[in-house]
C-alpha cells in the first residue's frame, strides 16, 4: 500500500525482471537462484527495480554474485 514508487505494478515490473533479468546487469534470478513467486512478495516491499535496487536483488541471492 506504499504505492507510487512503481510506475508499473510490482507483478509486472519486479516479477518480470526476476524472470528475464537485465541484459549485462542482472541475471534471471528465477532460473539462476530459483527465486519464485513466494520470494517475490518480499521483493515487492522494495521500490521497483532501479539502479540501486539491482544491488538489493543481487544481495538477496548471494549465489548471483
Curated annotation (Swiss-Prot):
Homotrimer. This is Trypsin inhibitor. It comes from Zea mays. Keywords: Protease inhibitor, Serine protease inhibitor. It comes from the Eukaryota. One of its GO terms (molecular function) is serine-type endopeptidase inhibitor activity. The record marks 25-26 as: Reactive bond for trypsin. After interaction with trypsin, the inhibitor consists of two chains (residues 1-25 and 26-65 above) linked by disulfide bonds.
